[in-house]
Amino acid sequence: INRAREHAVYSAIESLGISETVHYFDPVTGIKIASYLTDAHVCDSGNWEEVTKCIAALREFHSSKLHVAHSFDLWERLDFYESLWKGEPSIYADYDKTKRAVLSLKRFIDEQPKSIQLCHIDAVPDNFLFVHDTNGAEQIKLIDWEYAGMQDPHLDVAMFIIYAMYDREEAEKLIDLYFIDGCDKLTRMKVHCYIAVSGLVWSNWCEFKRHCGVEFGAYAQRQYDYARE
């Protein structure tokens, strides 16, 4: 994690009030002091009323079209996490085939129109917190901005889907929630491509963590399945 970049992101979003209130952030060590959010709960990905509110908050954040000096390169991360295996083979017998299929999506993704802007990248249900202000009004806070950078905001939609481990029907429902004015065929295809690529990115990350003795079980398998299927 590049803490200087994370610090830049918190500076960029400060005026939005969408994150926790940060009082101190050391861009070298990453030490952060923030106000504690009391009586908070994370988004329940199976509760579509909560999901709808979170996606609306994500869409509102995207509407700000903020910029920072760094980007999140999906393809670079794919190779980087694989490089952390130190030459060890994947636990998946068809990994090479799956990776080739995922890489073949790059041309299509690159050809699609995009509005490159600050994206959260880790916009998953667990990072949306439901809290209440001093008057008791419900608020949604989006936390954990360490991966945030310049990207296509539609990638954030894909990230929510794969962390929630949605099936195809649920994924389509989530896409429709985000695109309130309708989603054209090519954009929908692009989101599904992001689902596949992101699935392999986080699968590779899970394989690295496995080498470190940390197992992610069903989550790791599901990420690979998004890439493969």
Regions found by a protein language model. Name each.
Residues 1-75, 85, 89-97:
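ATP-binding pocket architecture of kinase catalytic cores
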Residues 66-121, 125, 131-133, 176:
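An alpha-helical support segment within catalytic cores of ATP-dependent transferases
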Residues 27-29, 133-137:
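Short strand-connecting beta-turns/loops that link adjacent beta-strands
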Residues 3, 189, 193-197:
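Start-of-helix signal in alpha-solenoid helical-repeat scaffolds, especially tetratricopeptide repeats
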Residues 221-229:
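Amphipathic, Lys/Arg-enriched alpha-helical patches that create a basic surface
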Residues 154-183, 196-214, 226:
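Active-site activation/catalytic loop segments of kinase-like enzymes and analogous catalytic loops
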Residues 118, 141-144:
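Pre-DFG segment of protein kinase catalytic domains
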